[in-house]
């Protein structure tokens, strides 16, 4: 059982992180002209592209969800077409066509950005974890870091013009600028609680909300913040004022409170939902929309006298919302979801796409184009164009699938919990269940041809290793004696006879006779090993807990610890030849080597979601994340024209 916990953390860390963010008040703000709301393998001969003289590097792009899959917390539109959203891992995306298309921008930070506020199409500020503040004056083409003067997370921001803005956050933090962020000055809030949202309508009048129904009000630009009586003890996550008098705050359990006199009195309103509301946006004193958990969207056209539930078409959590007029609005939230309305919410249309949001546990590519990913609830995805499109396949099971191995475009096997084994011979058009002979979870599988394959797992009660072997394409599976008293989770065969299995407490087993005999090898570590990749009988790499990477060049007679450069859990590894390999893991970690692991270089994944496996240049993980490594090429310079020399005149004799 030692290994099962870190493995499951791969699936749970992302959702727990989002949940903790929501529960601790990572959900925020508003302003009259802007809003920010926030809640907290099998090796292939094709190989990775080798660097060429024109190559300047590579980056990882999102293939699922699109335009990206990081949770979005803040959104700010300045007109019906132009808007910016921010989220996990420093995510900033921008649209200039009403959300039909979104461009990913470089924020220059990996800190989660919880709040964003634009006052016009060019000037905007985003705030986030550890006091991060980034600023743009050119619509996001460039973002520059600013010094907030605090290490507290900033959860919301509200600007009223290009120069004047206020950010609030953890532990009652408030910082203020009057010069576009060149300097930020700390203000005294009078509370130690997290301030979750803020809304200013002009340079002087602003309101911030917090836990326990706390509402703070200033009429002098924050020189003094005065506590108001909200009438609720619930956490307030969002607030929006349309002028100095008219404002609405929303929060836990569907809480809505309203003021028409600048907060002198707050009156409770019936939202019609028990789902928590994380964001709110009004375009005028009458027309407003609040969003929250379980896909809830509620709308008022009479200043909150009545709130009507609208159909979002999803149960995903919405965290931020921005309306620029009574009709045009955008809601954002978990796993990068984006919804758009142009009719006041009568119809909400998705502007983001996801072939799945189920976590993906393994992936197998047989060439640069053809690959299959498997995951939770029996999810199977297939691509034949390098991931440009992924298609759901029918697995016939709701059991989580933990491993997959294809030997060519047609023949593949997937394994999973409760002894699940599925087989396809037509590229996944049909998957046929096979009899494994066990109800124990199977974590990995490796086939070398259509007949010979090995699956590994462990008995959950005795925590002893399990190895199953087939020599007839899975028509029959036979348990092999292995002597392992640790879970077995990773397997790699290079031919029908030679294979290696890894697992808990640093265990490594090796066979040269198709598994008739499994021989323990000395790993030199007690760290759990989660995956192993061999490219031939001699060269192999295993990865695991605490950034562990082990390398052998002699078939495992000797394993050498390599410097991965990370202490994060590494859950997947894929080598395409003896030199080129990629390892992935927790919190979006990706490291790559081009020299057999003598050096490992960190690459920016663009996400903090856990990545479970990698095959060739495609990584998969939490929330259906699919990332693809693509080369960035230098533009080929245009040759200069060579001038035709003019004939020299013949000198006279």
Where does each model-flagged region fall?
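Residue-level hotspots at or immediately adjacent to binding/recognition sites across diverse folds
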Residues: 19-637
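Short, low-complexity, Pro/Ser/Thr/Gly-rich segments in the mature regions of secreted, periplasmic
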Residues: 643-652
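Bacterial N-terminal signal peptides
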Residues: 9-18
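Positively charged n-region of N-terminal signal peptides that target proteins for export
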Residues: 1-5
